[in-house]
Amino acid sequence: MSVAAAVTDATFKQEVLESSIPVLVDFWAPWCGPCRMVAPVVDEIAQQYSDQVKVVKVNTDENPSVASQYGIRSIPTLMIFKDGQRVDTVVGAVPKTTLANTLDKHL
């Protein structure tokens, strides 16, 4: 069971853009090997930063509108949103330290 909540095209605005705290969005798909590799890292980040950051996942197969809106061409893509704006992007399966360092810049 993932620690990160699933977000859809319908709930993206409310859950991500209108969030009062920074949001880490994991764009993924079930068939994507690297996505499965980075999933435990995303869950660890969600637990480690639970009081500072909201972590959500968007299945790009089921929610193509949001993926298209943000120009997702490769997955996994992890985006950080703050005050309704995208402030950073990490593409690919990256180590936890890389993701944590990127996140720390925006807290």
Swiss-Prot record:
Keywords: Disulfide bond, Electron transport, Redox-active center, Transport. The keyword Electron transport applies. Residues 2-107 form the Thioredoxin domain. Disulfide bonds join 32-35. One of its GO terms (molecular function) is protein-disulfide reductase activity. One of its GO terms (cellular component) is cytoplasm. Participates in various redox reactions through the reversible oxidation of its active center dithiol to a disulfide and catalyzes dithiol-disulfide exchange reactions. Belongs to the thioredoxin family. This is Thioredoxin 1. It comes from Synechococcus elongatus (strain ATCC 33912 / PCC 7942 / FACHB-805).
